[in-house]
């Protein structure tokens, strides 16, 4: 579930303004400024990049808005209800009062939405939210209190806290599997610097020990170095995540690994990707559903084009 990233300022510093490559591979795109993205089957839903707007559904210039009131959307996820039907869960904040937020469920069959009031708790706010088989997983932020963490709301049962999951930066839910990104901080080699160790992990609900899939280290300083990971997704027994590599040429990569750890991580081929740039890659959000993968490029610099693209054919990871 999107997220404003500290690396965006890095892209601005590089001052790169580049058009969509004209010869690069056959990834198809259309102009759109997308924030968060989610996909399931042949459905694609995305939020506005900034400010209040409409939730959009579909790929292409003719993509229509969903019949959901205009708002500021903070998190969206296409999943399934208890009967296996496709539904959309999302966090909506009032356009006029952005601190007044709630989580809603949209039913594509009835084209109706309803508030999930059971997720609310006084003094806390809901962050990212996911749904699978009718179970809602959500992050709860209570201002640094002991109540902070990930929670589950199963159909017909009360909200309960998820065991075995620390404070997370990103997470996803698919059936009984939770993937999450966790980070730990320690002092760096100089004043006003620090190290971040960031891990991608998966956990089976009901268990307390998670499996490590990837680990990166980033030195946070006026000139960041190392690598950072975020935006974990689950699909087809794989965990996906984005890696940001801080070198002279800032790079962004989409990786995946089987959730059982049976093979090492592999990276989405860079050839033909429209977010790849000469000095600094410009990947916004991404979404995956089986053989379909989408990604966005936001407009960091006035005059550059924001778009949503689809990877041509079956995505190749090596």
Predicted regions, residues:
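Bacterial N-terminal signal peptides
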Residues: 10-21
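Sequence signature of WD/YWTD-type beta-propeller architectures
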Residues: 24-318
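Acidic, Pro/Ser/Gly/Ala-rich intrinsically disordered segments
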Residues: 2, 22-23
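Bacterial N-terminal signal peptides that target proteins for export
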Residues: 1-11
């Amino acid at each position: 579930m999107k997220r404003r990233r500290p690396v965006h300022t890095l892209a601005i510093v590089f001052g790169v303004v580049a058009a969509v490559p004209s010869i690069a591979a056959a990834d198809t795109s259309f102009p759109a400024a997308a924030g968060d993205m989610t996909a399931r089957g042949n459905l694609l839903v995305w939020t506005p990049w900034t400010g209040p707007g409409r939730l959009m559904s579909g790929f292409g210039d003719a993509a229509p808005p969903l019949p959901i009131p205009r708002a500021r959307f903070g998190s969206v996820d296409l999943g399934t209800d208890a009967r296996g039907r496709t539904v959309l869960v999302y966090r909506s904040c009032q356009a006029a009062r952005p601190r007044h937020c709630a989580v809603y469920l949209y039913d594509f069959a009835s084209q109706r939405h309803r508030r999930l009031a059971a997720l609310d708790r006084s003094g806390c706010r809901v962050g990212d939210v996911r749904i699978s088989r009718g179970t809602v997983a959500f992050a709860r932020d209570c201002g640094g209190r002991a109540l902070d963490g990930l929670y589950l709301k199963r159909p017909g049962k009360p909200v309960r806290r998820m065991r075995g999951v620390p404070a997370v930066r990103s997470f996803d839910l698919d059936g009984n599997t939770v993937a999450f990104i966790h980070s730990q901080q320690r002092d760096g080699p100089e004043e006003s610097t620090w190290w971040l160790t960031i891990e991608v992990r998966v956990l089976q609900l009901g268990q307390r020990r998670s499996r490590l899939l990837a680990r990166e280290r980033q030195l946070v300083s006026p000139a960041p170095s190392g690598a950072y990971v975020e935006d974990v997704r689950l699909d087809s027994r794989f965990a996906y995540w984005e890696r940001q590599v801080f070198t002279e040429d800032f790079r962004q990569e989409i990786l995946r690994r089987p959730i059982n750890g049976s093979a090492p991580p592999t990276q989405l081929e860079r050839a033909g990707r429209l977010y790849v740039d000469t000095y600094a890659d410009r990947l916004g959000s991404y979404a995956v559903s089986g053989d379909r993968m989408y990604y966005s490029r936001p407009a960091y610099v006035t005059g550059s084009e924001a778009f949503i693209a689809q990877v041509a054919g079956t995505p190749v990871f090596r």
